[in-house]
Amino acid sequence: MTSNTPLPPCSILLLAGGRGQRMGGQDKGLVEWHGEPLIVHLHRKVRPLTDDLIISCNRNRERYAPFADRLVSDDEEDFPGPLAGIRAGLKAARHTHLLVLPCDVPRIDLALLHNMREAAGLNSEKPLMLRHDDHWEPLLCVIPVALLPAFENAWNAGERSPGRVMRNLDAQALVCPDNDPRLANLNTPELLSSHNTVSD
């Protein structure tokens, strides 16, 4: 990848609006890792990268508010899934692109975030998703905000998979190494515990 690729201006969306089933119903972004809520780790990584930091959350808004420029919520009740949060983020975004991250990837680093933006700039009209171990990571992506109508059309047609929506829009892949530790989803108590010996 060339170092002179322009980086698209990005709003950043942190997804923290899920039901937290794998965490026993806990609000996942507020679960602690290394003594701090997961959302704090993500905020520390991304805050210097944008002046438009959005958090998608459906509860505990007062606890998330200090870590975002704006909060968004799903437009339907009963936790309809991450595509609802992405749609809300696209509607709120002030920049041309929306970089999306789940709240349970505290080991992501600045180099990968830079690479995501740089790769998105190579074909700025297409969504970009991370890919590793022969599968996509649809919640680690960069989406042109101009594609909001396509996301809305897919939602209204009954689609609920962000990955399918983006693949249907000819998503680009940013390929990461197999078993890349930066992509570890710490979405169960067991995974949080197993990664507690490794700092972010």
UniProtKB/Swiss-Prot annotation:
InterPro entries: MobA-like_NTP_Trfase (IPR025877), Molybde_CF_guanTrfase (IPR013482), Nucleotide-diphossugar_trans (IPR029044). Its EC number is 2.7.7.77. It catalyses: Mo-molybdopterin + GTP + H(+) = Mo-molybdopterin guanine dinucleotide + diphosphate. It is found in: Cytoplasm. SUPFAM superfamilies: Nucleotide-diphospho-sugar transferases. GTP binds at L15, A16, G17, K28, D74, D104. GO terms for molecular function: GTP binding; metal ion binding; molybdenum cofactor guanylyltransferase activity. Gene3D superfamilies: Spore Coat Polysaccharide Biosynthesis Protein SpsA, Chain A (3.90.550.10). Its main location: cytoplasm. Keywords: Cytoplasm, GTP-binding, Magnesium, Metal-binding, Molybdenum cofactor biosynthesis, Nucleotide-binding, Transferase. Its cofactor is Mg(2+). Mg(2+) binds at D104. One of its GO terms (biological process) is bis(molybdopterin guanine dinucleotide)molybdenum biosynthetic process. Pfam families: NTP_transf_3. It comes from the Bacteria. GO terms for cellular component: cytoplasm. Belongs to the MobA family. NCBIfam families: molyb_mobA. Monomer. Transfers a GMP moiety from GTP to Mo-molybdopterin (Mo-MPT) cofactor (Moco or molybdenum cofactor) to form Mo-molybdopterin guanine dinucleotide (Mo-MGD) cofactor. The N-terminal domain determines nucleotide recognition and specific binding, while the C-terminal domain determines the specific binding to the target protein. This is Molybdenum cofactor guanylyltransferase. It comes from Pseudomonas fluorescens (strain Pf0-1).
